[in-house]
Amino acid sequence: MQKQAELYRGKAKTVYSTENPDLLVLEFRNDTSAGDGARIEQFDRKGMVNNKFNYFIMSKLAEAGIPTQMERLLSDTEALVKKLDMVPVECVIRNRAAGSLVKRLGIEEGIELNPPLFDLFLKNDAMHDPMVNESYCETFGWVSQENLARMKELTYKANDVLKKLFDDAGLILVDFKLEFGLFKGEVTLGDEFSPDGARLWDKQTMDKMDKDRFRQSLGGLIEAYEEVARRLGVNLD
């Protein structure tokens, strides 16, 4: 399957068409961004690590019965995926307090949230991805009530699968975001799951093993990503 025209260039990935109208090529670049793209740097191997990491996680979620767009890996940095009609709202699960939640509510970082919080954000960099709710989605027609309920159900299901997966690897799944779209009318998990879009802490040291290392200028970004992948058993060779 050969990539053809560039359809979209995001902050860390590029999407290409293929000869099949139902399939796309997702290319992971070495770019890393913070502040809605205000700060961008390149890190060797990052595209490869995230591509293989994403394939591994999507495979685990598919095994658990969650529909995903993943078809197969094409190269170290490329994957073949289904073409989805993307929903412009992302789903976030928070198992512990971190990031914007701490700033917004003034609560202590790291406290456990039981039950986990479920948030919705409009995907709009210019507006800094504002927080929205089910009522906004219905009023503005971003996604139907039925499909939103399915997105929420699948997000919680993914959380159950991934919390155990990371816990077994000595990691805490603090929070993460998922993006969904429709494939032939079915709600399907799209975009990616990687340390770019999740917070992962070491269970023993509480060290941050995700993109917060870049956001907070902690250093060792790729080393942390590769360590997470190694613990999970992701083959990076």
From Swiss-Prot:
GO terms for molecular function: ATP binding; phosphoribosylaminoimidazolesuccinocarboxamide synthase activity. The keyword NADP does not apply. It is an enzyme of class 6 (ligase). GO terms for biological process: 'de novo' IMP biosynthetic process; cobalamin biosynthetic process. InterPro entries: SAICAR_synt/ADE2_N, SAICAR_synt_PurC, SAICAR_synth, SAICAR_synthetase, SAICAR_synthetase_CS. It holds the Pfam family SAICAR_synt. Pathway: Purine metabolism; IMP biosynthesis via de novo pathway; 5-amino-1-(5-phospho-D-ribosyl)imidazole-4-carboxamide from 5-amino-1-(5-phospho-D-ribosyl)imidazole-4-carboxylate: step 1/2. The keyword Magnesium does not apply. Keywords: ATP-binding, Ligase, Nucleotide-binding, Purine biosynthesis. One of its GO terms (cellular component) is cytosol. Belongs to the SAICAR synthetase family. PANTHER family: MULTIFUNCTIONAL PROTEIN ADE2, SI:DKEY-6E2.2. This is Phosphoribosylaminoimidazole-succinocarboxamide synthase. The lineage of its organism: Bacteria, Pseudomonadati, Pseudomonadota, Gammaproteobacteria, Enterobacterales. The gene is purC.
